[in-house]
Amino acid sequence: MTQPPNRQPVRILGIDPGLRRTGWGVIESEGNRLVFIGCGSVEPPDTLPLAERLLAIHRGLAKVLADFAPDEAAVEQTFVNKDAGATLKLGQARGVAMLAPAMVGLSVAEYAPNLVKKTVVGAGHADKNQIQMMLKILLPKAEPPSADAADALAVAITHAHHRVAAARLKAVGA
């Protein structure tokens, strides 16, 4: 007879990177159960030079990491838009968003925006309102102050679901 897996809550930090507003959301996952822990955003002033904005994002995420002590992190991948310069700058913010948790020894998963939407809403082209409606169902205590914080919670939920699925596949030897 096999023993059930030892389920311990895993604290997950989801990050939605951006130069103007980097959203973050922290949840705990235990099996299929999700618990809201906190969310918010890091908002460096637009007047700062790029390097200082990136530093502000790093410092803000470092504070979140210290305050909430997550076990794992997940970051939303960036999409390429028509403005190559904007895409490049967003990529720099994403690099900072991946670096901050890696610097404290966390594994960092990456998820495409369409996968996040499909996981949370069931449709890969869901809009922000649909994501926020599903967040109210999945995390009733969450009241994200911005769409970026809501997106970060969606990234954390996506990671929680994918890690559970991966554990199930591993358990059956697939």
Swiss-Prot record:
Please give the Gene Ontology molecular function terms for this protein.
crossover junction DNA endonuclease activity; DNA binding; magnesium ion binding
UniProt keyword terms in alphabetical order? Cytoplasm, DNA damage, DNA recombination, DNA repair, DNA-binding, Endonuclease, Hydrolase, Magnesium, Metal-binding, Nuclease
E.C. number: 3.1.21.10
User: One GO BP annotation here?
Assistant: DNA repair
User: According to its UniProt record, where is this protein located?
Assistant: Cytoplasm
The catalytic site is made up of 16, 76, 148
Catalytic activity reads: Endonucleolytic cleavage at a junction such as a reciprocal single-stranded crossover between two homologous DNA duplexes (Holliday junction)
Pull one GO CC term from this UniProt entry: cytoplasm
Q: Which positions bind Mg(2+) 1? A: 16, 148
Give the cofactors, semicolon-separated: Mg(2+)
Superkingdom is Bacteria
Q: How is the cofactor bound?
A: Binds 2 Mg(2+) ion per subunit.
Alphabetized PROSITE patterns for the sequence: RUVC
Q: What are the binding positions for Mg(2+) 2 in this chain?
A: 76
Name the family: Belongs to the RuvC family.
Query: What is this protein's function per UniProt?
Result: The RuvA-RuvB-RuvC complex processes Holliday junction (HJ) DNA during genetic recombination and DNA repair. Endonuclease that resolves HJ intermediates. Cleaves cruciform DNA by making single-stranded nicks across the HJ at symmetrical positions within the homologous arms, yielding a 5'-phosphate and a 3'-hydroxyl group; requires a central core of homology in the junction. The consensus cleavage sequence is 5'-(A/T)TT(C/G)-3'. Cleavage occurs on the 3'-side of the TT dinucleotide at the point of strand exchange.
| SUBUNIT field | Homodimer which binds Holliday junction (HJ) DNA. The HJ becomes 2-fold symmetrical on binding to RuvC with unstacked arms; it has a different conformation from HJ DNA in complex with RuvA. In the full resolvosome a probable DNA-RuvA(4)-RuvB(12)-RuvC(2) complex forms which resolves the HJ.
Protein's recorded name: Crossover junction endodeoxyribonuclease RuvC
Organism, as annotated: Rhodopseudomonas palustris (strain BisA53)
Could you tell me the gene encoding this protein? Answer: ruvC
